[in-house]
């Protein structure tokens, strides 16, 4: 095996990106966000350029505090954190899933404030625009919460969609039930106007919806293995996951927890573990189906224009290799040094 081939092989056979994957994580941490962020900090070949925060699993102010806690605990206090919008594009009180993630977003664990931080003065949208403009075509965005900050970046800079390398979105429910309402997934439901702007922007977008993420979960046995592992984040993650796991038992009747955000991070680094279908996606912005993601798969030729006409297709995750995604998550979490 030559050096180039060796660079393609990570521990346990997981491919390392042949070129460094630079990513800004737009996030509402959040318990499963925290798991994904710790994975990103540990992943070979991945450089976290910064974290931008948004409401969703908790308020934006709590999301910022939690992002700083995560950077501190990961030994990465130099990573910049930019605070994002406190409300959706249209204004109003944001949806906050404290019943899933606790009042603090970290399972009511009451961790102390970090001692060393790098919270920047820029807003999340300003940070996104500046970093992507500095390195056009090189920086991806992993969007783990409502898409408000991304939409604001696109409004601020009309060329943002063409300069960002790709945007991987945790959001939507494609031919599957929602989790905020029967028709809508939480991130999209929390700011449907922002989601529609992003999905129709022309950027290179990959969407990972509930139809994929609910196939991948850690059982109680997996969590026990994590707690007993030598991973440096294991105890912290197990502590915050208890609240999240108990909510799954109550809401879904399963002794497990879905890995929505870790799956989406894996789709960024290992898209080969998924298959995707392309189509134009629009978002319903009002009524009882607010937040519903509707995809034109191009299966027929329409006789006249419709609201999907003229927009660029995006890539929607269609299938997932569950064992490979689980193995990748365990590799990063169980062996973090």
From Swiss-Prot:
One family name in Pfam for this protein: IU_nuc_hydro
Record's signal peptide: none
Catalytic activity of the protein: uridine + H2O = D-ribose + uracil
Family under the similarity heading: Belongs to the IUNH family.
Function: Involved in pyrimidine breakdown.
Positions of the catalytic residues: 260
Organism: Oryza sativa subsp. japonica
A GO term, aspect molecular function: purine nucleosidase activity
Gene Ontology, cellular component aspect: cytosol
Enzyme Commission number: 3.2.2.3
Entry protein name: Probable uridine nucleosidase 2
Alphabetic keyword roster: Cytoplasm, Glycosidase, Hydrolase
Compartments (UniProt record): Cytoplasm
Chief subcellular location: cytoplasm
Source domain of life: Eukaryota
Spans through the membrane: none
GO biological process: purine nucleoside catabolic process
